[in-house]
């Protein structure tokens, strides 16, 4: 219960003003108090103070939260409902430990090699042409709706995870101006290898020597989302120790979720006297790729991209890191690219980690609103800096029969530089 104590005074301060209701994606879909930040705060308080049993039904309301953090920003008295929800999930894991969580997060996701082995069938599905055959024969239409949508979420998988083929050091082109540590996220390595390879090309082209340690583990966000706080702390200690071996100016990642989590390592380990200072120093160095590139002088891209683009703000970037101007600034560097802002660009797309699996109907309802906003822009490209958002948006667009492509802003910048051919 220790995680709850610092927040106990705050949640008693809830004045039930209802401002959080207007921004909560789950409340907007169901108009139920228990699906709102205000309702979850009340349930947490009553459960922890003994007025209600900490039952599976009560805890399920905490898992219904998409952790988009809009409620944190809008609360006039400083309650942070999204953080309280994560703490309540930890309480549930303490009271009723779930073995599958330990197996998944301590076993499968603790080592990159184990996770890569687990996804081998998916790569074979792509490499052997089975996926192409499934679509050619229309067999995908025979799958149950949920399975069909999950299959459609998968991008075109690389034959090998990027972590396996990426050199630990990528030299700067020309004079080295910066020495950068690169945190390659699990999803980026397994699913979006081409995208992260593009990120490294952009960094190298602009005078950065990039160090990408192969020994890093998961950032810890999946384990945190399911209440396994001790595992998050273990990941943090390991990753900090890995990067301490290298003298880098900054630690950069092109995954919004990873970046948001890495920046919280100082908070996660603030109670640990041995690690608190090291974690705080590590967190200060972490930057999203767009954040870092916006701080350094960049070469002007030579290639034009004559298309309309719109930008979706990932929750873990806009609210988790307060980064939203920088990606747009990068897009503005590309000649011919017309940025058309969508309505509610910073509203959650419904991805939220595993929510498309665990809260399928809600995730699709939230995504529907986002797709309507995208369609209104008539953009041919949707840019976003989060792999989860990219998969969610791509699936929704395909489901509506639309051909707009979903890409990382830095991948577009790399394209304007000439990509791999421009090296």
List the predicted regions and their residue ranges.
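Non-heme iron-sulfur electron-transfer modules
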Residues: 2-3, 27-60, 78-104, 402-412
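N-terminal glycine-rich anion-binding loops that anchor highly charged ligand groups
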Residues: 19-22, 32-37, 210-212
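Short amphipathic alpha-helical interaction patches enriched in hydrophobic/aromatic residues
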Residues: 28, 48, 72-75, 266, ...
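Short, intrinsically disordered, charge-biased short linear motifs at domain edges
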Residues: 1-11, 51-62, 171, 204-208, ...
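Alpha-helix capping and helix-loop boundary segments enriched in small/acidic/polar residues
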Residues: 12, 31-35, 223-230
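Cysteine-centered iron-sulfur cluster-binding motifs in ferredoxin-type domains/subunits
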Residues: 9-27, 55, 59-79, 316, ...
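Iron-sulfur cluster-binding electron-transfer modules in prokaryotic oxidoreductases
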Residues: 81-423
């Amino acid at each position: 219960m220790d995680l709850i104590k610092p927040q106990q005074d705050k949640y008693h301060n809830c004045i039930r003003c209802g401002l959080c209701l207007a921004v909560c994606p789950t409340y907007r879909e169901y108009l139920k108090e228990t699906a709102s930040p205000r309702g979850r705060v009340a349930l947490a308080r009553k459960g922890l103070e003994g007025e209600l049993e900490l039952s599976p039904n009560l805890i399920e309301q905490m898992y219904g939260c998409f952790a988009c953090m809009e409620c944190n920003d809008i609360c006039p008295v400083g309650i942070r409902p999204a953080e309280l929800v994560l703490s309540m999930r930890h309480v549930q894991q303490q009271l009723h430990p779930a073995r599958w969580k330990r197996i998944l997060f301590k076993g499968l996701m603790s080592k990159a090699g184990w996770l890569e082995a687990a996804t081998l069938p998916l790569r074979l599905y792509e490499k052997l042409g089975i996926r192409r055959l499934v679509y050619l024969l229309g067999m995908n239409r025979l799958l149950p709706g949920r399975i069909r949508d999950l299959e459609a979420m998968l991008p075109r998988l690389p034959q090998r995870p990027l972590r396996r083929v990426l050199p630990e050091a990528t030299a700067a082109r020309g004079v080295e101006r910066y020495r950068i540590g690169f945190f390659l996220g699990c999803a980026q390595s397994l699913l979006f290898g081409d995208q992260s390879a593009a990120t490294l090309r952009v960094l190298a082209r602009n005078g950065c020597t990039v160090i990408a340690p192969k020994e890093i583990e998961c950032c810890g966000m999946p384990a945190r989302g399911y209440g396994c706080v001790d595992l998050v702390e273990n990941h943090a200690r390991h990753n900090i120790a890995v990067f301490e071996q290298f003298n880098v100016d900054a630690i950069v990642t092109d995954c919004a979720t990873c970046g948001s989590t890495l920046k919280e390592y100082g908070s996660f380990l603030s109670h640990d006297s041995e690690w608190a200072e090291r974690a705080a120093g590590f967190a200060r160095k972490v930057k999203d790729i767009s954040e870092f590139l916006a701080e350094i002088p960049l070469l002007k891209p030579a290639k034009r991209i004559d298309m309309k683009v719109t930008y979706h703000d990932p929750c873990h970037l806009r609210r988790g890191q307060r980064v939203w101007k920088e990606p747009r600034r990068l897009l503005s560097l590309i000649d011919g690219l017309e940025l058309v802002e969508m309505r509610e660009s910073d509203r959650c797309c419904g991805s939220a980690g595993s929510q498309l699996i665990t809260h399928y109907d809600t995730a699709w309802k939230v995504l529907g609103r986002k797709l309507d906003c995208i369609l209104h822009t008539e953009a041919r490209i949707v840019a976003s800096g989060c792999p989860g958002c990219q998969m969610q948006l791509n699936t929704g667009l395909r489901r509506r029969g639309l051909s707009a492509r979903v890409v990382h802003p830095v991948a577009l910048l790399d394209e304007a530089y000439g990509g791999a051919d421009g090296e």
